[in-house]
C-alpha cells in the first residue's frame, strides 16, 4: 500500500493518557479485554438488526449475524470478526481515537486513585482500549454499508493510521486483529478462550463461534493379499482380500459455538441458578461485581411480557449526569432486540435498575417515535415500577443489604417521592433517616409514627447541611425539652421530596424551621406566654423599628430553650437550607428566588438573659441598643442556616465589640477606617460608642 494512501491521526489527549495508563500499569485481570470486544461486537449486531426491521436490504451484504473468534498461535494473533453495522471512515476517526467519551477522564482519575478497577472500563464507554492490555498492536478492518472498507492501525504510540482496505472483503462488519504481547500468548489457548466466553459472554444473544483445531483419527485402508499369485483353480483355496484398518491422526478446523444457552428470561425462574443470573447481569451491564438483587417475572393476560431486573451493588459514576442514557433496560420484542435506551420504559429516577424486557405485543418494526405514544409501553412501565418497589422491599428484609442499597440509591428513592404521585407513599416507606433519638441508626417513617408521643399529631423534621449542623440547631431545643423526636434530613434532595410528601400515614410533615409550629402547652405555659408578651411589647416594637424591612415581624418564641433568638421562614416559602441550595444553582430563576425567599420572622427567647437585658436597654433608650440588635440579628442568620449578605460589616461589628469589651480605645485612623467600612450599608449603622464602662461587661 502506497504511503500516500495512509492518513495519520493523533490520539486525543485524554485517549492517549488512558492508553499510556493501560500499557504502562500492571493489571492482574487483563482478561476483561475479551468481554469488552465481544460486547462491542454485540452492540454493532444490535444496530444492524434494528435497521433491518424497517429495511431488510441492509442485511443483503451479509445475512448471518454472528461473532467469530480466531486464535492463531503461529502468527501470535487473536482475531474477532462480527457481521454488525461496521464503521465508516468517519466513524473510525471519531470512535477510535480523536473524540474521548464523557467518562474517559473520570475513569482515569478513579483508576489512578484506586476507586475504579480496570474491569470497569466498559462502564465508562472506553472498553475498546482494553485490547492494549494484551496486545502491542491492534488492527481494525471495517465495512459499513454506506462506505468503502477501511483499515485502522495503531501500536499506541500516540497516533493511528487509516487507509482503504484492500485485504479480504468483509461484506459488512468489523474484524479486529490483536498482535499479542509475548507474555500474553496464553489467551490464544482454546480452553482459556472458552472459559472466558462462558464466564463473561455466555448470554450474548448472537452465536459466538471459536475456530478450533481438533485431532481426529481416520481409517487408512490397505489391501493385503495372502499369496503372491491369485489362482482361479477351484482346488486352490480362495484367497480373500483382507482390509487392514490403520488409524491415522489428522488435524481439522472446526467452528465451535460457545454460547448455546437459551435466553435466560424465557426460562422458569425456579430453573435458573444464582450463578446464571450473576453471569447474565455481568454480560448486559459491564459490571464486574455481582448484582445486589434480582427480580425475574412474567406478566400474562391481556398483555404479555417477561422481564429480569437487577439492582447493582454500587451506583455508577455518572448516575445523575444529564448526558448519560436514560436507563439501562434492554427492550426486546419476541426475543428480537429493539433498543436499550427507551426513555419511556421506566422512570428516570429508576435509571440505576438494569435488565431486559421482552414483549409479545409490541410490533417488531416499531420506531422510537411511535414507541413514545404506545399504550402497551405505558402498561409495561407501570408494571416495572411496581416490581421495582417489590424488589426494594425484598432487599429491605436484610438490613445489611439495604444499608448498601440506601447509601447508593437513596437519592433515587427521594426523586420517586418527588415525581411519582401514584407511588409516593410506597417510596416513602423505603426512606430511612437519623433522628434526635436514633443516634447513628436509620429509622423508617413508620417506626417514627409508631413511637410518637400520645397526643402528637404531626411529624417534625429539620433540613440542613449536615447531621452536626441540625442536631446543634437552635430550632431543635424546644422539641428536645418536650421529649419530641425530630427527623434529620441532611441530603439536599430531601428539600424537594418534602415539598411533595405533605403527610405520611395521615400525619402532616412539619418543618420546625418555619412558621406554623404549634407545640402543646400546659395552662401554666399559656399563662406565662401572655405575661411575657405584655412585658416585652415595647422591646418587640423597637427591635422591629431597628431592623425595618429585614424582617417581616418580631415575636416571642415558644421553640427556643437555650438560644436568645432564631430566624424562621414562612410556612410556604423556602427554608434556610433550601435558600442555600438555590443560591448554589448557576441557572436559577432569580425572580423565583426573591419570591420564595420571603421575609423572615425574628423570634426572641424571653427567658434568655441577653433578651432580658436587651429589654432593659430598650426601656433606657441606650445608645448601644441598635448595635446589640444588629449583632443578634446577624448571629441569628448564621445559627438559623442563612448566609450573611455583608460578612465584612458583621466582622467589623464583632471586632469593635471585642475592643469595647476589652476597653481598647481606637486610634483615629483605625476609627476612620472602621467607620468607613461599617457605613457602607445604609441599613446597618456603625457601632455607637459612649463613655460608659464596658457595655459587654453590663451584658455579662
From Swiss-Prot:
Q: Where can this protein be found? A: Cytoplasm
Keywords in alphabetical order: ATP-binding, Chaperone, Cytoplasm, Nucleotide-binding, Stress response
List the InterPro entries: HATPase_C_sf, Heat_shock_protein_90_CS, HSP90_C, Hsp90_fam, Hsp90_N, Ribosomal_Su5_D2-typ_SF
Entry GO terms, CC: cytosol; extracellular matrix; perinuclear region of cytoplasm; phagocytic vesicle; plasma membrane; protein-containing complex
Which Pfam families would you find in this protein's record? HATPase_c (PF02518), HSP90 (PF00183)
Q: Where is the composition biased (Low complexity)?
A: 666-683
Tell me which residues bind ATP: 40, 82, 95, 128, 368
Q: Which SUPFAM superfamilies match?
A: ATPase domain of HSP90 chaperone/DNA topoisomerase II/histidine kinase (SSF55874), HSP90 C-terminal domain (SSF110942), Ribosomal protein S5 domain 2-like (SSF54211)
Q: Which GO terms describe its molecular function?
A: ATP binding; ATP hydrolysis activity; ATP-dependent protein folding chaperone; unfolded protein binding
Under SMART domains, the record lists: HATPase_c (SM00387)
Q: Which CDD domains match?
A: HATPase_Hsp90-like (cd16927)
Composition bias, kind Acidic residues: at what positions?
685-694
As annotated in the record, motif TPR repeat-binding runs over: 696-700
Fetch the Gene3D superfamilies from UniProt.
3.30.230.80, 3.40.50.11260, Heat shock protein 90, C-terminal domain (1.20.120.790), Histidine kinase-like ATPase, C-terminal domain (3.30.565.10)
Record-level GO BP terms: cellular response to heat; protein folding; protein stabilization; regulation of aggregation involved in sorocarp development
- Sequence segments annotated as region (Disordered): 665-700
Q: How does it assemble?
A: Homodimer.
Domain text from the record? Answer: The TPR repeat-binding motif mediates interaction with TPR repeat-containing proteins.
- What family does the Swiss-Prot or TrEMBL record give for this protein? Belongs to the heat shock protein 90 family.
Role noted for this protein: Molecular chaperone that promotes the maturation, structural maintenance and proper regulation of specific target proteins involved for instance in cell cycle control and signal transduction. Undergoes a functional cycle that is linked to its ATPase activity. This cycle probably induces conformational changes in the client proteins, thereby causing their activation. Interacts dynamically with various co-chaperones that modulate its substrate recognition, ATPase cycle and chaperone function.
The protein's name in its UniProt record: Heat shock cognate 90 kDa protein
Organism annotation? Dictyostelium discoideum
User: Gene name?
Assistant: hspD
Amino acid at each position: 500500500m502506497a504511503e500516500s494512501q495512509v492518513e495519520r491521526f493523533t490520539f486525543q489527549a485524554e485517549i492517549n493518557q488512558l492508553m499510556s495508563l493501560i500499557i504502562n500499569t500492571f493489571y492482574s485481570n487483563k482478561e476483561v479485554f475479551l468481554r469488552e470486544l465481544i460486547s462491542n461486537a454485540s452492540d454493532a449486531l444490535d444496530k444492524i438488526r434494528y435497521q433491518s426491521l424497517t429495511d431488510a436490504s441492509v442485511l443483503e451484504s451479509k445475512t448471518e449475524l454472528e461473532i467469530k473468534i480466531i486464535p492463531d498461535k503461529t502468527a501470535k494473533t487473536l482475531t474477532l470478526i462480527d457481521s454488525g453495522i461496521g464503521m465508516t471512515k468517519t466513524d473510525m476517526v471519531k470512535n477510535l481515537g480523536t473524540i474521548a467519551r464523557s467518562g474517559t477522564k473520570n475513569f482515569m482519575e478513579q483508576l489512578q486513585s484506586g476507586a475504579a478497577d480496570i474491569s470497569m472500563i466498559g462502564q465508562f464507554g472506553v472498553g475498546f482500549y482494553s485490547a492494549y492490555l494484551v496486545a502491542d498492536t491492534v488492527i481494525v478492518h471495517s465495512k459499513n454499508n454506506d462506505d468503502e472498507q477501511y483499515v485502522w492501525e495503531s501500536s499506541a504510540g500516540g497516533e493511528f493510521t487509516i487507509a482503504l482496505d484492500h485485504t479480504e472483503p468483509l461484506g459488512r462488519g468489523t474484524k479486529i486483529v490483536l498482535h499479542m504481547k509475548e507474555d500474553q500468548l496464553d489467551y490464544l489457548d482454546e480452553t482459556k478462550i472458552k472459559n472466558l466466553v462462558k464466564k463473561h459472554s455466555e448470554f450474548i444473544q448472537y452465536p459466538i463461534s471459536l475456530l478450533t483445531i481438533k485431532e481426529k483419527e481416520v481409517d487408512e485402508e490397505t489391501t493385503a493379499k495372502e499369496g503372491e499369485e491369485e489362482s482361479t483353480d477351484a482346488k486352490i483355496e480362495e484367497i480373500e482380500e483382507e482390509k487392514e484398518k490403520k488409524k491415522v491422526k489428522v488435524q481439522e478446523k472446526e467452528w465451535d459455538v460457545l454460547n448455546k444457552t437459551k435466553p435466560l428470561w424465557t426460562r422458569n425462574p425456579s430453573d435458573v441458578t444464582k450463578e446464571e443470573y450473576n453471569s447474565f447481569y455481568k454480560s448486559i451491564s459491564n459490571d464486574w461485581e455481582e448484582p445486589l438483587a434480582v427480580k425475574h417475572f412474567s406478566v400474562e393476560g391481556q398483555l404479555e411480557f417477561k422481564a429480569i431486573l437487577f439492582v447493582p451493588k454500587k451506583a455508577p459514576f455518572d448516575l445523575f449526569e444529564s448526558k448519560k442514557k436514560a436507563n439501562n433496560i434492554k427492550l426486546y420484542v419476541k426475543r428480537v432486540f429493539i433498543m436499550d435506551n427507551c426513555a419511556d420504559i421506566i422512570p428516570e429516577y429508576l435509571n440505576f435498575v438494569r435488565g431486559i424486557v421482552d414483549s409479545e405485543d409490541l410490533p417488531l418494526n416499531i420506531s422510537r417515535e411511535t414507541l413514545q405514544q404506545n399504550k402497551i409501553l405505558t402498561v409495561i412501565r407501570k408494571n416495572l415500577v411496581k416490581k421495582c418497589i417489590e424488589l426494594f422491599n425484598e432487599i429491605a428484609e436484610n438490613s445489611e443489604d439495604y444499608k448498601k442499597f440506601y447509601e447508593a440509591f437513596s437519592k433515587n428513592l427521594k426523586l420517586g417521592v418527588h415525581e411519582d404521585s401514584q407511588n409516593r407513599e410506597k417510596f416513602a416507606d423505603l426512606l430511612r433517616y437519623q433522628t434526635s433519638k436514633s443516634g447513628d441508626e436509620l429509622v423508617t417513617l413508620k417506626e417514627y409514627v409508631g413511637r410518637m408521643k400520645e397526643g402528637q399529631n404531626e411529624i417534625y423534621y429539620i433540613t440542613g447541611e449536615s447531621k452536626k449542623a441540625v442536631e446543634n440547631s437552635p430550632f431543635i431545643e424546644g422539641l428536645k425539652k418536650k421529649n419530641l423526636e425530630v427527623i434529620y434530613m441532611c441530603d439536599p434532595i430531601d428539600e424537594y421530596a418534602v415539598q411533595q410528601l405533605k403527610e405520611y400515614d395521615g400525619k402532616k410533615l412539619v418543618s420546625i424551621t418555619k412558621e406554623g409550629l404549634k407545640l402543646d402547652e400546659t395552662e401554666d405555659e399559656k399563662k406565662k406566654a401572655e405575661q411575657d408578651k405584655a412585658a416585652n411589647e415595647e422591646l418587640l416594637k423597637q427591635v422591629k423599628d431597628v431592623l425595618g424591612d429585614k424582617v417581616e415581624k418580631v415575636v416571642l418564641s415558644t421553640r427556643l430553650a437555650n438560644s436568645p433568638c432564631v430566624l424562621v421562614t414562612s410556612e410556604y416559602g423556602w427554608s434556610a437550607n433550601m435558600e442555600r441550595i438555590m443560591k448554589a444553582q448557576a441557572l436559577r430563576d432569580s425572580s423565583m428566588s426573591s419570591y420564595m425567599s420571603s421575609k423572615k420572622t425574628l423570634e426572641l427567647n424571653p427567658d434568655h438573659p441577653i433578651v432580658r437585658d436587651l429589654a432593659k436597654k430598650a426601656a433606657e433608650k441606650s445608645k448601644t441598643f441598635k448595635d446589640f440588635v444588629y449583632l443578634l440579628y446577624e448571629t441569628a442568620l448564621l445559627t438559623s442556616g442563612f448566609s450573611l449578605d455583608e460578612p465584612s460589616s458583621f466582622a467589623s461589628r464583632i471586632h469593635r465589640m471585642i475592643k469595647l469589651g476589652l476597653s481598647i480605645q481606637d486610634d483615629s485612623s483605625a476609627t476612620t477606617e472602621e467607620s468607613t467600612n461599617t457605613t457602607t450599608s445604609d441599613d446597618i449603622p456603625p457601632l455607637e460608642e459612649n463613655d460608659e464602662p464596658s457595655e459587654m461587661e453590663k451584658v455579662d
